[in-house]
Amino acid sequence: MPQNDHGRLSLGRATPSDLPFIMETERLPGFDKMVGRWTADQHKAAYSNPSYAYLIGTEIGGEAFGFAIIRDLDDPHGNVCLKRIAIASPGRGYGTPFLGMVLDWVFREATAYRVWLDVLADNDRARHVYMRGGFIEEGLLRRAYKLPDESRIDLILMSILRPEWLKQRLTRSTE
């Protein structure tokens, strides 16, 4: 399993036994708005779909702390979507290293050229983490997301390209 620079976190492919943790994390207060949530059947369908990858972040000792769902692994143009990423207990400093580990996996294992995502326009914390991770804001999807209360909110489209990721990796390795 790849480890981050601090050696205390690792990343691997999720197994079916990780789905309860993923669903519990999606159901934490406020996460339905920021992260979204799926039913068990939706997760099982995506998990068994070869165009998806479920990744799980663990601390030393094996305790899960976060997950990521990647989709479009079969995109012929190398455009892979970071569909969902979440940390079960935010504020512990795991977000940025976890995102870096996920990007390393996507660019190495999935051989993506571009990783894209959309984020709620008012989710400043996530946007900050994505920008620190090398993502660039590409545009605004106006009122594109319906919230649980049926109101609508803008999404910000963001991406990072393989050359940007490589440059960032080189910069990190020389620091």
Language-model region placement:
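Short acidic N-proximal helix/loop "leader" segments that mark the beginning
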Residues: 1-5
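Conserved catalytic-core motifs of GNAT/GCN5-like acyltransferases
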Residues: 116-118, 136-153
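Conserved active-site alpha-helix within GNAT-family acetyltransferase domains
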Residues: 96, 122-139
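Acetyl-CoA-dependent GNAT
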Residues: 13-17, 23-90, 96-99, 105-110, ...
